[in-house]
């Protein structure tokens, strides 16, 4: 609870990374990975370097996440704000999710994008979110508020990690 957790370059090395049962933490994953799972995390700020595969977040709330990944999947999450570079994004059983464009920066990031086979100048589809519950909502007797929204472009300041020990 309330910790600052930092995984530096070489700590993950393209392997999977799991964040679970965190409360009021700041997490910096300053490396590239194959897959990232966030389970049962609440009131956290998370910066995740490029992910070659999927970023999964489940049973979490009040997260502020900056991440670059091939695919994002959220399930049973609420009140989360994500700044993304993603080829695809999908949510299921989520509420009040806000998406914005990638805003992260740290030393070595370009090499991590290359290692994860992501092109930062390429297609960022953070704004094309598939909601698995949209059909159910459309069939409901009463109209339902959208489960997700987009943050205006440029609304987020750059989250730049000046060194592995401190975020600016």
Sequence positions of predicted segments:
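Extended, compositionally simple hydrophobic/Ser/Thr-rich segments
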Residues: 2-111
């Amino acid at each position: 609870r309330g910790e600052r957790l930092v995984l530096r370059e070489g700590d993950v090395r393209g392997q999977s990374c799991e964040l679970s049962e965190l409360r009021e933490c700041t997490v910096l994953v300053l490396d590239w990975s194959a897959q990232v799972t966030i389970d049962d995390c609440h009131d956290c700020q998370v910066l995740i370097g490029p992910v070659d595969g999927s970023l999964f977040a489940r049973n979490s709330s009040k997260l502020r996440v900056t991440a670059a990944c091939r695919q994002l999947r959220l399930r049973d999450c609420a009140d989360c704000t994500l700044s993304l570079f993603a080829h695809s994004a999908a949510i299921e059983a989520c509420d009040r999710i806000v998406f914005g464009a990638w805003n992260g920066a740290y030393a070595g990031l370009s090499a991590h994008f290359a290692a994860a086979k992501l092109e930062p100048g390429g297609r960022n589809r953070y704004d094309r979110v598939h909601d698995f519950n949209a059909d159910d909502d459309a069939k409901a007797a009463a109209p339902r508020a959208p489960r997700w929204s987009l943050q205006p472009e440029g609304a987020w300041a750059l989250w730049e990690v000046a060194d592995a020990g401190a975020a600016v």
